[in-house]
Amino acid sequence: MWPFGKSSISIVAATTEFYVGISAAFEKNYEAILATFHTAYDENCPADEAIYMELMPAVWALGIEPVQNIWGEHEFKRVRSEMLVKINQSHAPMTEFLVERFLRHTQLLREGIRNGSATYNADHIIKQLGLAPQPMTSIKLASQLAMLVLPYWKEVDQKYRLF
């Protein structure tokens, strides 16, 4: 969970800035990420689909609980719907089927966070979604996620002193 504990922090500004940075990094590194996923998944799982099922929900899950706790359920649902619209307008528009899988993935991640039974586990989520995990998939996912998240996490932390 994000350690939002200081009253001087603008939660909306910090969260918005963080996701804007992530989105920019995602766009900038899209081809490299796509190449990684081509090697991480079997032929039955298109790489574009894998990105939206794995990387984006993982990034979203980083802030899902604290944002909901601070903003409240109504505001959280509004922000989530806006995010889905933005994802839908990006490189590989998601069909209703993919949106449902995205939401299911997010639900699985939240359950693991809430009951403390699991942190983000790519292979477990892949199996829950009926896909076949490949060797090194989790490591590749983790490294790609870290590549995108860490620089912006650092910038947001320096600006808003989250820690």
Tell me the role of every PLM-derived stretch.
Residues 1-6, 162-163:
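Short, aromatic- and cysteine-enriched interfacial helices/patches
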Residues 5-46:
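Short terminal alpha-helical segments
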Residues 29-72:
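N-terminal interaction modules that seed assembly of large macromolecular complexes
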Residues 38, 60-68, 84, 88, ...:
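Alpha-helical repeat scaffolds in large eukaryotic proteins
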Residues 50-54, 58, 78, 96-101:
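Residues within HEAT/ARM-like alpha-solenoid scaffolds
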Residues 64-79, 92, 96:
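Short, solvent-exposed secondary-structure capping/transition elements
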Residues 74-86, 140-151:
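Amphipathic alpha-helical scaffolding segments
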Residues 99-163:
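Low-complexity intrinsically disordered segments
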